[in-house]
């Protein structure tokens, strides 16, 4: 897997950098694993915008991905690697020995024809799913369950992985991609290896239109709005914010304010908090 650059034939190709699709072998998705999904466009059940800058984009069909890996002891072969428009990771199409077909997140290094398993006593190989208590220390895992049987909820984006740091009784300490160290129950399942398509972090859309194809609408700065639309708006010309610091459109402090509850019950499972990203290195824009 590599990235592809373009000559500056047009302004849109001058800075365009995309991943090549050499690892994608299947042109069309498996029909039995595809469903139609209504796109919310950032609206809630009342039609009110709860997530700004969403809407439009190319039509998509949702791929049913197996995050639980609950077919224990049944071998499966990797039949194809498919593209998924809903995530930046690739999907591996599995053909199980009993005839069932399922999608899983394609780990880095997985190949066509490789056999994968899930269960307590399966080999320690990339693509196999095991309980965290059965995985050796120092191993890289992804698609980690937070609760047994609920399915993988953490470490699912392209190029990400968590590392097993220690085993303490019925819990396992995981170092997450955010550098947070968290305790997870040992019977929770995880998949060995890291998620593939790690080169996605080196890509560049190149033009605004490609972002619209992905369903992202323009972000308008608050300082160019009217005072009735944003706390930063109004004034003559390029006026300053007029407050002690930048705020959200609803008047709450932005860029660095902690939003996690202090007395959240799951705080006792966090051994080390994630590394805070400074405002300067984040390069945040005027909300």
Swiss-Prot record:
GO-annotated molecular function: rRNA binding; structural constituent of ribosome; transferase activity
GO cellular component, one term: large ribosomal subunit
Region (Disordered): 221-287
Protein name: Large ribosomal subunit protein uL2
InterPro entries per record: NA-bd_OB-fold, Rib_uL2_dom2, Ribosomal_uL2, Ribosomal_uL2_bac/org-type, Ribosomal_uL2_C, Ribosomal_uL2_CS, Ribosomal_uL2_dom3, Ribosomal_uL2_RNA-bd_dom
Subunit structure, as described in the record: Part of the 50S ribosomal subunit. Forms a bridge to the 30S subunit in the 70S ribosome.
SUPFAM superfamilies linked: Nucleic acid-binding proteins (SSF50249), Translation proteins SH3-like domain (SSF50104)
A Pfam entry, by short name: Ribosomal_L2_C
Keywords annotated in UniProt: Ribonucleoprotein, Ribosomal protein, RNA-binding, rRNA-binding
Biased composition (Basic residues): 258-287
Alphabetical GO biological process terms: translation
Function: One of the primary rRNA binding proteins. Required for association of the 30S and 50S subunits to form the 70S ribosome, for tRNA binding and peptide bond formation. It has been suggested to have peptidyltransferase activity; this is somewhat controversial. Makes several contacts with the 16S rRNA in the 70S ribosome.
SMART domains: Ribosomal_L2, Ribosomal_L2_C
Family: Belongs to the universal ribosomal protein uL2 family.
């Amino acid at each position: 897997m590599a990235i592809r650059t373009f000559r500056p034939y047009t302004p849109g190709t001058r800075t365009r950098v995309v991943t090549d699709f050499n690892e994608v072998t299947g042109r069309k998705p498996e029909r039995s694993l595809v469903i139609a999904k209504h796109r919310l466009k950032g609206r809630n059940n009342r039609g009110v915008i709860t997530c700004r800058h969403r809407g439009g984009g190319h039509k998509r069909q949702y791929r049913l991905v197996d995050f639980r890996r609950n077919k224990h002891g049944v071998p499966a072969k990797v039949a194809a690697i498919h593209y998924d428009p809903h995530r930046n990771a690739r999907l591996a199409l599995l053909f199980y020995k009993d005839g069932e077909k399922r999608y899983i997140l394609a780990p880095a290094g997985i190949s066509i024809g490789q056999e994968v398993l899930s269960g307590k006593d399966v080999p320690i190989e990339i693509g196999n799913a095991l309980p965290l208590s059965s995985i050796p220390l120092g191993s890289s895992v992804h698609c980690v369950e937070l609760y047994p049987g609920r399915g993988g909820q953490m470490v699912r984006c392209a190029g990400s992985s968590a590392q097993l740091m220690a085993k303490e009784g019925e819990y396992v300490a995981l170092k997450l991609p955010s550098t947070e160290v968290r305790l997870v129950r040992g019977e929770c399942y995880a998949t060995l290896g890291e998620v593939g398509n790690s080169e996605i972090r080196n890509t560049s859309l190149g033009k605004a239109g490609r972002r619209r194809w992905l369903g992202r609408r323009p972000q308008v700065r608050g300082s160019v709005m009217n005072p009735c639309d944003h706390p930063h708006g109004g004034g003559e010309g390029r006026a300053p914010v007029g407050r002690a610091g930048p705020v959200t459109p609803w008047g709450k402090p932005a860029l660095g304010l902690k939003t996690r509850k202090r007395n959240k019950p799951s705080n006792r499972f966090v051994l080390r908090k994630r590394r805070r990203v400074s405002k300067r290195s984040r390069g945040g824009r005027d909300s």
